[in-house]
Amino acid sequence: MRKAVNTAITALSVLAASDASAASRPATALAPQFVALSEITTPIFGESRIEGALSVTLVLEADSVGAADTLRTRMPELRATALTAALEFSRLYASGYTPVDAGRLSADLNAAMKRAHPGIARVLIVRLDAIPA
């Protein structure tokens, strides 16, 4: 019993020490860096016509402050990459009459955007709509 208590106390002291070291770092090192993209709207193609529109709003989480600054300067290129991935997704998987597979879209966008810029930690979907025509 005493050994279990000592193990628990040791584990708690390690956790407390790691929290104290995290608190001693500057707030800018702890805060994630976010860069917002304007809304992207792509057509949803049916068999012979446009069935609706897919509308998505994205926020990029950068690895660091420097990466966030670089993302802001490369915004046209990143927006073009996101638009291409959204078009491909809407062509293959979207419908104006069914729910959007946000998990698949997130995976596709993350893969495409991370290839375009390695400073992107992840792509967050903050708004997603599929609107029938």
Question: PLM features: what roles do these ranges have?
Answer:
Residues M1-A133:
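Flexible, low-complexity charged segments
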